Each structure stands twice: as C-alpha cells, then as structure tokens.
Amino acid sequence: MKNIIVIKLGGIAIENLNDAFIQQINAWHLENKKIIIVHGGGQVISNLLTKNNHSTIKIDGMRVTAKNDLPIIYDALINIVGHQLLERLKESNLEFFQFKEKIKELVSAEFLNKNIYGYVGKVKEINTMLLEKMLSRDIIPIITSLGVNEQGEYLNVNADHLATAIAKKLKVEKLVYMTDVPGVIEKDKTLATLTINEAKTKIENKIITGGMIPKIESAIQTLESGVESILIANNLQKGTIIRGD
C-alpha cells in the first residue's frame, strides 16, 4: 500500500506537537494518504518507574525491563503518553484508534535476550490485516511500543524498531522519525538529502554518531525492503530525506 505514511513520535516530539503537525495530518488525509502513528514513552516511563521506586538501567540504549516493571510501563505508555497524544490529535477532527489491550492482536514479539534485557522484546509479526482494515475505514491507528509473546506476556519493544517493522511489512510510501533534532547534522547544517551509500560513508567516517546511528541503520534496512523514503526531522515537512541509491 504505497499511500501509507508511518510516523514515529519520540517523547519530546509528543510534548512539542504543534498546529503545523495537525495541519499536515489533515492535508495528507485530504490527499487520501493513510497514516499510522507509533510512539514510545521515554522520559515518562523513567519518571514513573522512579516514582514507584523502580530503577532504570539501560544497556546499549535498551531499557532493562523486569517483569514487575511492565504494569508501570503499560500505564506510562497507554494512560499517560498515549492519552495525551490522542487528546492533542483530536483537534484534527479525524478519527483515531488507540491500541490498548488490542495491542495483543497486533504485535507479536519474542524476547530479545531475556538474560541481558529481561522483558524486552523484538517484533516477530505484525497483524497487517487489522491495520489495513482500519486504514480502509479512514481510521488512524495510534500504536504504542509494546508487544505480546506466545505466553501472552507483554514485552517492552523499541518504538523505532516497531515503526520500522510496520513500515517494512506494509511497504509504505514514507516513514517519518520525529525527533528532538531537525535532521542529520553535518558541520552545524541539516542535510536535506542522503542516499544509502552516503549515509553508510558518513557513519564510517564518524560524521553520523551517537543515537543517530541506529536510526540511520534502521532507515537503510527499511529502504532496502521497498519503502520509498524516510524523513528524519523535528517536524513533518522539512528535515533529512533518505532515499535509495
């Protein structure tokens, strides 16, 4: 379905959603674009864990998750971040569906490495039929970064990886990573475009560093699966567009 746009929102991006974001969502809707929104929890999860006297440990950027952390993480993702996002998006007058318990029907996951990360999952399967049914009715799904394993247990899933998995599975037109930076930065300037080979070279030459590396690597894999373009930005219009060579 080439008219689908997947938008991944980080915690800071959700806090800073502005009228321009709502206007762009409405504009895409008028162009008959189908939209899917994926979000994580970030600092909200950390704050709620701390409030409940649970520690936050990260290994390789992944939040180590104990089984008794999951009710708190669920609460942060669904009842705080997801609810806040839904209330903001309602200003567009479009129809949205927030995945809560129904996430069990959408995202199948398995342990990433239980011995190291605990109840952290990697995406195993996406129920694309469920998404396509919603999109055909002009409903915009709001999907949080959780998955469910074969035992029916919730697993904490990386939101970037979940958005990538959905984009690859549906072979969407565009994937947007909304972050707290305007795009890929080189010499204090935002790069307008990047090809796959240029991106790989900039990683090798340490021009692209830190938290941007996994985003770029995910972008490359997504493009190679058939997605047309990826936008990394702090808005929906202008940032760094990555395309195939």
Swiss-Prot record:
Its EC number is 2.7.2.8. Keywords: Amino-acid biosynthesis, Arginine biosynthesis, ATP-binding, Cytoplasm, Kinase, Nucleotide-binding, Transferase. Substrate binds at residues 41-42, 63, 156. It comes from the Bacteria. The keyword Transmembrane does not apply. It is found in: Cytoplasm. Pathway: Amino-acid biosynthesis; L-arginine biosynthesis; N(2)-acetyl-L-ornithine from L-glutamate: step 2/4. It catalyses: N-acetyl-L-glutamate + ATP = N-acetyl-L-glutamyl 5-phosphate + ADP. GO terms for biological process: arginine biosynthetic process via ornithine; L-arginine biosynthetic process. The keyword ATP-binding applies. The record marks 8, 215 as: Transition state stabilizer. InterPro entries: AceGlu_kinase-like_sf (IPR036393), AcgluKinase_fam (IPR004662), ArgB (IPR037528), Asp/Glu/Uridylate_kinase (IPR001048). CDD domains: AAK_NAGK-like. One of its GO terms (cellular component) is cytoplasm. Pfam families: AA_kinase. HAMAP family: ArgB. Catalyzes the ATP-dependent phosphorylation of N-acetyl-L-glutamate. Belongs to the acetylglutamate kinase family. ArgB subfamily. PANTHER family: N-ACETYLGLUTAMATE SYNTHASE (PTHR23342), N-ACETYLGLUTAMATE SYNTHASE, MITOCHONDRIAL (PTHR23342:SF0). This is Acetylglutamate kinase. The gene is argB.
